[in-house]
């Protein structure tokens, strides 16, 4: 019985995740230089509406490996030199602004507030699903500070 409920919940979660990924689109990012961003509506939490934002450098031709950068506490992705360098070394580059950080802070939220680091799992799962859907077979995680704890 438990396995059946767990499987159904997993199926519903994956269905929602797929739906979220399909409905979001990339737009130019504030970093310029061809950086793009894509904001995902996530399920509401105890403060209401929640989003996370994936930033990327346009994909390199014929490259199927990517690095996903996850920032630390009280931070967000702004180090375009990092993305440029990773791109120059033959990897597609992505960075996640987790919920309530940087591009993902909404007016109803206390910036950086979470009750558990597990809240970020859905944001990272969304990023990984999107990166895979864009043709990357190999994904390496790179993190700073709190991003490494998650």
Task: Please report, for each region that a protein language model flagged, where it lies by residue.
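Bacterial Sec-dependent N-terminal signal peptides
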Residues: 1-26
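N-terminal cap/lid segment of alpha/beta-hydrolase-fold proteins
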Residues: 25-60
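Short, surface-exposed "cap/lid" segments of acyl-processing enzymes
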Residues: 57-101, 107
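Residues at the starts of beta-strands that form the adenosine-phosphate
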Residues: 92, 137-138
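Alpha/beta-hydrolase active-site loop
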Residues: 113-134
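Gly/Ala-rich beta-loop-alpha elbow adjacent to hydrolase catalytic centers
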Residues: 142-147
């Amino acid at each position: 019985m438990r396995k059946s409920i767990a499987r159904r919940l997993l199926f519903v979660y994956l269905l929602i995740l797929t739906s979220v990924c399909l409905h979001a689109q990339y737009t130019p990012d504030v970093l310029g230089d061809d950086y793009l961003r894509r904001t995902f509506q996530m399920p509401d939490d105890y403060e209401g509406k929640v989003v996370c934002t994936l930033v990327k450098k346009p994909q390199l031709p014929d490259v199927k490996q990517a690095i996903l950068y996850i920032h630390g506490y009280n931070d967000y992705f702004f180090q375009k030199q990092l993305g440029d360098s990773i791109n120059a070394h033959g990897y597609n580059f992505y960075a996640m602004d987790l919920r309530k950080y940087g591009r993902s802070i909404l007016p109803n939220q206390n910036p950086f507030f979470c009750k558990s680091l597990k809240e970020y799992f859905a944001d990272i799962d969304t990023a990984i699903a999107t990166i895979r859907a864009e043709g990357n077979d190999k994904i390496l995680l790179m993190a700073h500070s709190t991003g490494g704890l998650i």
